[in-house]
């Protein structure tokens, strides 16, 4: 995250951004293959504030390998000091392509713990920060069988998050791996809505060289009957 990139967003009317630490424990970031540092997250957040962004979300993951309740508490205290406008707390869900799954032997000595105490702690701190829950969703293979919860300050809720979960809103997505979705306004006889998607390639280099193809995919999706 750089000043130049943030200014491009500001100059094009983007008002809500996410700066996602996942955790504020550097050892965990190194373990799970995240290539940013805790200090980079803090510096990026402060830079965005300085440039006028007043609706910033931060994502956390609870249940990361080797992290204790104390580690989660430490992360929440750093978040409290930064005071983001939105906080999204994810329970760890190991996907098929995730590094934790692909290299599972490397992580077998690290316990993955996500308890009601972990979730309650994040909820308590969020409330103390003046953030209130406004959306919730679940995924497969979630640690502790819990859920993901989005918190927001009054007037700062991400409407997009609600719309995408309800699957009632067409969405144009840009970037490698992004999925565009068209929801037909006219309902089916059973009351459901027709939904079709157009996905961008995941590889960044491929996305750049095939950008015209990606644009054409979206164009076809939104012009078809």
What are these regions (language model features)?
Residues 63, 141, 177-180:
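Short, glycine-/Ser/Thr-/acidic-enriched flexible segments
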Residues 1-122:
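Conserved non-cysteine loop/helix-boundary elements of the Radical SAM core domain that shape
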Residues 150-225:
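Radical SAM enzyme core and accessory elements
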């Amino acid at each position: 995250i750089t000043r130049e990139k943030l200014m491009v967003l500001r100059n094009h009317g983007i008002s809500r951004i996410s700066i996602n630490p996942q955790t504020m424990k550097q050892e965990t970031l190194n373990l799970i293959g995240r290539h940013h540092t805790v200090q980079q997250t803090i510096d990026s957040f402060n830079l965005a504030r300085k440039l006028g962004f007043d609706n910033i979300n931060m994502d956390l993951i609870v249940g990361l390998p080797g992290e204790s309740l104390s580690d989660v508490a430490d992360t929440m205290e750093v978040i409290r000091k930064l005071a983001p406008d939105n906080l999204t707390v994810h329970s760890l869900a190991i996907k098929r392509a995730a590094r934790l799954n692909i290299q599972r032997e490397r992580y077998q000595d690290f316990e993955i713990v996500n308890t009601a105490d972990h979730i309650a702690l994040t909820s308590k701190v969020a409330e103390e920060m003046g953030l209130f829950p406004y959306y919730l969703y679940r995924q497969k293979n979630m640690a502790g069988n819990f859920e993901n919860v989005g918190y927001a300050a009054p007037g700062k809720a991400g409407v997009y998050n609600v719309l995408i979960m309800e699957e009632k809103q067409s969405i144009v997505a840009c970037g490698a791996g992004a999925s565009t979705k068209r929801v037909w306004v006219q309902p089916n006889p059973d009351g459901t809505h027709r939904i079709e998607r157009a996905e961008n390639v995941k590889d960044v280099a491929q996305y750049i060289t095939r950008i015209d193809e990606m644009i054409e995919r979206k164009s076809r999706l939104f012009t078809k009957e």
